Amino acid sequence: MKAIVIGILASLFFAVTFILNRAMELSGGSWLWSSSLRFIFMVPFLCLIVIMRGTFTPLLLEMRKKPFYWIKWSFVGFVLFYAPITFAAAYGPGWLIAGTWQITIVAGVLLSPLFYVKQDMPGGPQLIRQKIPLVSLGTSVIILIGAALIQLQHAESLSGRMLLFSVLPVVIAAFAYPLGNRRMLEEYGGRLDTFQRVLGMTLASLPFWLILAAYGWWSDGLPTASQTVQSFIVAVSSGIIATVLFFWATDMVRDNPQKLAAVEATQSGEVIFALLGEIVLLSGVFPSLLSFAGLFIIIAGMMLHTFASQPRKPKKKAQSNLTA
């Protein structure tokens, strides 16, 4: 239950990404700067935190052992996640991006067979390939249906261009994020803490963000003061607070596929927070009755996930009242 609450809190801070990315695009900011500045701003904060915790040197030692592993999965988990998200914001509204992003809930469940979990066997601990938790898949699909209902009130305004450039990139991001996170969690979940993993992945992906920033400078010039400030807010809110909270929550349940799916499902809260944020901050369209039904289904789906992930208490054997 604690991991799920932390996951919901993370979704609140993640929602800032969808709202501010859309605001930056509406004000003429380049998606290249929106994506790169977030991770560039994250570096000094995370370095300070990890150094103060005295865990910076162990992180560097681990990264030196497998540099290409870090680069590969940091690229998948961070670059293929956030660059498509900011690119999509240039072509579609925040509600569409946040709604499409909910595919990641099902994606995380479907990716389960790619990973292994350590189990105690008669001959000693062994790595067992995970299976798709069908109960979690069912409740994840329920949440996805709720997210789809929220989008229906806006469906008439969608063009083919908007679908191609705003939906497809988010689908790629929806699979890349849990894949990169789980790969790093599988390899370093027991050796590195959450702050170390986030910093390590940020440092490993930094060359790609610097390339995007250089291209943004060449093609669009320097970012505006407004975009810089908003990117800084996204870096702190989503890049540091939300990412650390979410990685912490997944780390707590890394050995239980069903609980891990439940934590990943808490990301559905983003569509709720993003919708409310756009209404309040960007004068977005007020939800219809169908959208409210979608919100209710999302909340119900998260509650089902929470219930399904709780350990079952063994039934006590009935004691016989018969006397000899």
From Swiss-Prot:
Top-level division of the source organism's lineage: Bacteria
Transmembrane segments annotated in the record for this chain: 5-24, 39-61, 68-90, 95-117, 130-152, 162-179, 199-218, 228-250
The species this protein was found in: Bacillus subtilis (strain 168)
Keyword Cell membrane: yes
GO cellular component: plasma membrane
Any matching Pfam family: EmrE
InterPro entries: EmrE
Gene symbol of the encoding locus: yjlA
Protein location: Cell membrane
Name assigned to this protein: Uncharacterized protein YjlA
Record bears the keyword Transmembrane helix: yes
Keywords: Cell membrane, Membrane, Transmembrane, Transmembrane helix
Main location: membrane
Membrane topology of the entry: Multi-pass membrane protein
